[in-house]
Amino acid sequence: ILIEKTIYTAALFFFRFGLLSLRSPIWLQKRCQIRGLDILQNHIDNNENVILMVPHSWAIDVPAILLASKGMPVSAMAKKQKNDVTDWLMHKQRVQYGGRVYERSGGIKPFLKSIRDGYVGYYLPDQDHGPEHSVFVDFFATRKATLPGLGKIAKLSRSKVLPMFASMNTEDGTFDIEILPAFELDKGDEQDARTCNQAIEYFVSSKPEQYMWVLQLLRSQEDGNNYYNIFKPRYDTDWQVKK
């Protein structure tokens, strides 16, 4: 059932994806409900830097575009798409009302500088970047290779970290965005990584179909196995998840 709901949610979102660029900012604002916007606004009004910790939901780009349309442009890092046309279209959509998106391969310094310059940081915490860059901490009923560096990024950019999650209502096509109060990330890499995962668990538990499970979030395992290849012998294909 979860697989069916996830595919249905993803398909509906992609059918509406182009509307984020084709329609006006007023159209988008009328179709978004934000809980906790006052939390973010209070930090900005107090001249405090902010990083939004945003798990990979299907609607992950919506809050960034929405906030920029409200005069709060964000700064993010992203991996270049393999298709140049797709990469150009996605970049144009993300920064259409302001903001910055840096190529991840260029390092973190431009991202940190933009936050210190007043942009709202947009940090994606949940992709598996391999065991050499991660710590293994609890995630739901398993253990997950999790990036440990958000606490250091917050310290270097002198920022408050606010968890945020975006979801799409599949009944009417509107978007729901929830922002939580800032949490502290100063207890060491493993505890900080676990704190991030707990925030993801909170968001995803009530709306699991909104999450991008297709990202192979559990590819790296402490025992070295690659569980995404378990069912490979059932199919006449040499497809394999990259290690």
Language-model features and meaning:
Residues 1-54, 87-92, 98, 177, ...:
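Membrane-anchoring hydrophobic helices of lipid-metabolizing enzymes
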Residues 2-5, 9, 92-96, 191, ...:
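A non-catalytic, amphipathic alpha-helix used as a structural packing/dimerization or gating element
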Residues 4-5, 25-30, 54-56, 73-76, ...:
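Short acidic/polar alpha-helix capping motifs at helix-coil junctions
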Residues 12, 46-105, 117, 132-135, ...:
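Catalytic core of membrane glycerolipid acyltransferases/transacylases, capturing the structured
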Residues 30-33, 83, 101-104, 143-144, ...:
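A conditional alpha-helix N-cap/helix-loop micro-motif detector
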Residues 38, 58, 151:
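Active-site phosphate/pyrophosphate-handling residues
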Residues 41-45, 69, 73, 105-243:
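Non-catalytic C-terminal accessory region of glycerolipid acyltransferases
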